[in-house]
Amino acid sequence: VNFRYNLRRKGMVKDTIHTTELDTAYARGVELLQKRKYAKALYILNDYNDRNTVVAHLSLDHNERAMELLATMPKDAVTEYLRAIACSRLGRKEEGRRHFLEACRLDERMEYRGNLDPEIAELLKQ
């Protein structure tokens, strides 16, 4: 399973100060996430409360916290997919299945991705 890491955050407030300076701390957190150094990545990404923060929490099996963060995010295919994974791990199979099917409805490519993910495959066995 491949996760896409975003170095920007969707839905940022319009009064954000624009700068050409890269957020090196955030970039370092994403780099650590890509290197699978999840605890170190979470230490950096924790204040951002974005999708990459959710991925770090899921990678450390902090599934309830991941669900809390996902509840604050706009619904899209990726957030629904991540909700499905968290639900699967929390034993909430039917809820996870609904989230996965919604992810597929929002983006048909998620169906292919789900077929490669054993946690999603487990949801679909029902």
Locate predicted features.
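TPR/TPR-like alpha-solenoid helical repeat scaffolds
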Residues: 55-61, 88-89, 109-126
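TPR/TPR-like (Sel1-like) alpha-helical repeat modules
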Residues: 47-50, 74-75, 88-112
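Long, contiguous interaction/recruitment modules in multidomain scaffold/adaptor proteins
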Residues: 1-30, 35-40
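Alpha-helical adaptor scaffolds
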Residues: 27-34, 39-89
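Helix-start (N-cap) detector for alpha-helical repeat units in TPR-like alpha-solenoids
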Residues: 22, 77-81, 111-112
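Generic alpha-helical secondary structure signal
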Residues: 23, 27, 64, 94, ...
